[in-house]
Regions:
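Acidic-enriched, low-complexity/disordered segments with a strong bias for Aspartate over Glutamate
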Residues: 5, 24, 30, 45, ...
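Charged, gly/pro-rich, cysteine-poor intrinsically disordered low-complexity regions
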Residues: 254-296
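Helix N-terminus capping/helix-initiation residues
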Residues: 59, 199, 235, 295-296
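Generic intrinsically disordered, low-complexity segments enriched for polar/acidic and small residues
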Residues: 1, 16, 58, 90, ...
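A broad structural signal for short, well-ordered beta-strand segments within beta-sheet-rich domains
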Residues: 32-39, 92-95, 189-191, 258-266, ...
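Assembly/oligomerization scaffold segments
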Residues: 1-125
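Charged- and aromatic-enriched interaction segments used to assemble
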Residues: 103-270
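Residue-identity detector for glutamine
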Residues: 12-15, 27-29, 41-42, 99, ...
Length: 296
């Protein structure tokens, strides 16, 4: 229990693959020992998983490889609460703060990365239009063409049983990363729209701003975001329903202070110390983007 801490995780493995090289080639380099610190961010307000690493390089790795951007980064991360291990395929898109180390015999710098799927999808732009198509169907087509091929699939629990989904949810397997899924909530009504040279993520956000649901509940809070488990095109109400029907989601409690004593392990895992909703409602934005409709 000496390593128990819900707020801490470590990189068990970090491997860089130069642009154009194969994962199993001799060019792939393990940089785990160089990582001094790192952060990873995922949010329902973000279309992609992002992060950065601070490296202490005493072997001249930055010039020996060399690091130029667009390298593939493979991460294996373990948490100090339940020992959960997560793996992420990412792409390096920026290298900055390069300077001489305090010891004078090396350098320090920061690598910025984004999930590989989001990176490769959003280095291009698309101009397209949809006529008499539901919003969720348009999103499915944009994702299938620009992110990865997707096929209908079920979400499975750890015991092998099929996981229950909120009303009407369509679940897809992401073929390029088969362990991940894409969850799409149905929208109401058909739309006509032209996408004017947006990246795929911007295009889906454009559709989201014009989408609303009606069958299960009235809502215009559609979001497109990425997590460890995959991608989501859903409303805030869908997230509430998903939590309510998923028995494997633990009950969490809000408290500004949480004990760090390993004896209080259960309490630490179930405590939220900061909670906020940055996007509750914005009628002006919804009306401007077309997410409102008139009924007579």
């Amino acid at each position: 229990m000496e390593k128990f801490n819900p707020g801490i995780c470590e990189i068990q493995k970090a491997q860089i693959v130069p642009f154009g090289a194969a994962l199993d080639s001799e060019q792939a380099q393990d940089i785990t020992a160089l990582v001094a610190s790192f952060t990873i961010q995922q949010s329902i307000d973000s279309t992609a998983i992002r992060g950065n690493m601070f490296l202490l390089d005493n072997i001249g790795f930055i010039e020996r490889l060399p690091l130029r951007g667009e390298e593939e980064l493979l991460l294996e991360i373990k948490s100090f609460d339940l020992g959960t291990v997560r793996r992420l395929k990412a792409k390096i898109y920026k290298i900055d703060d390069v300077q001489r180390s305090e010891s004078g015999n090396g350098s320090t710098y920061t690598l910025h990365f984004i999930s590989k799927l989001s990176y490769e999808a959003n280095i291009k732009y698309l101009i397209t239009s949809f006529n008499n198509v539901r919003g969720d169907k348009a999103v499915e087509k944009i994702f299938d063409k620009n992110y990865s091929k997707i096929t209908p699939e079920n979400e499975f629990k750890k015991d092998g049983q099929i996981a229950q989904q909120p009303y009407g949810t369509r679940v897809f397997k992401i073929e390029s990363e088969k362990e991940r899924l894409f969850f799409i909530q149905p929208t109401y009504g058909n739309m006509r729209l032209t996408i004017p040279r947006y990246s795929p993520a911007e295009a889906i956000a454009f559709v989201a701003n014009r989408s609303f649901s009606k069958d299960q509940y009235l809502s215009s809070t559609f979001r497109f975001f990425e997590t460890w488990n995959g991608f989501y095109y859903v409303t805030d109400e869908w997230l509430n329903d998903k939590a309510a029907i998923s028995k494997n989601i633990p009950t969490l409690n809000y408290n500004t202070f949480s004990s760090r004593d390993p004896v209080d392990a259960a309490l630490q895992i179930s405590t939220i110390q900061d909670f906020r909703n940055n996007r509750r409602a914005n009628v002006a934005e919804d009306m401007f983007s077309g997410a409102y409709t008139n009924t007579f």
